[in-house]
Amino acid sequence: YVFSMKAHGTQKRASDDPYFSHPLEVAGILTGMQLDCDTIVTALLHDTIEDTVATYEQIEELFGTNIARMVDGVTKLSELEYTSETLKQAENFRKLLLAMSTDIRVLLVKLADRLHNMRTLHHIQKSEKRSRIARETLDIYAPLAERIGMQELMNELESLSFPHVYPEAYESIMKRLDYLHDNTENIRDEVINELEKIFLKNHLEVEVVGRRKQPYSIWKKITYRNVSLENQADLFAFRVIVDGAEDCYRALGVIHDY
C-alpha cells in the first residue's frame, strides 16, 4: 500500500483523482472476489513498473519473487496492443492473453483493472478514445471474463461498454426496456413469490432473486438471431440460491415438476 502510494506520488487520473486511487479500487474489486493476499498485493502494485520509476528488482526484494512475477505479468499484458476489430483477430488476441497468463491470478488482476477503467471511462474527454477502449473491452475482456467463468464481471464489462460502442442502439433498447419495465415489473415479483411458495411447500429454504436481462445481451439476440425485443421470452432472469449441492438438485427437481 505505502510503496504503491509513494511510487505513484502526485500522478493524477483523468478524473483528477490521485492515481493511487486506481490500484486501490482494483484491489477492492479483487478483495470482493475473496482472492488471496498475493493477488491483492499485486493489484496494489500492478502499475508501478509500467508507470513509475519502481523496478522489478525493488518489488522482488520487498515483496518476493512470486509477487514480482505477477506484477511483471500484468505489465506485459498491458503492453499488448489490440488494433484489429475483426472477430478472428479478437479471438487470436484473447488466446494470446490466456497463453501469457501462466498464473490465472494475473489475468484476474488485468480484468479488475479494466473493470475499474470502464467504471471511470466517462472522465476521458475524447469520445474516440472512449469508444476505442469500450470496443476493446467488448471484443477482448468481456469474452475473456466469460471464458474463465466470471459471469457477473462479463455482464458489467458489457453493460459499461455497450453505450460507447453502439450509442444509438443502446438508447433505443433502453427506451423500450423502460417501457416494458413499467408494464412488467409486477410479473417479476409474481414469479418470485410463486417460486418461493413452491419451495416452501417442498420444505426448501431458498432465496429467489430476479433481474432484468442486460441490454447488450438483448441487443445481440436482436442483431444476430433476428429476434425482436417483444418476442424475447427471457427478458427476466431468476436465480435460486440454496445452501448446498444437495439442495440445488432438489430445487431443480421441484422446478422441473412444477
Model-derived features: positions:
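Active-site helical microenvironments for divalent-metal-assisted chemistry
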Residues: 1-237, 241-258
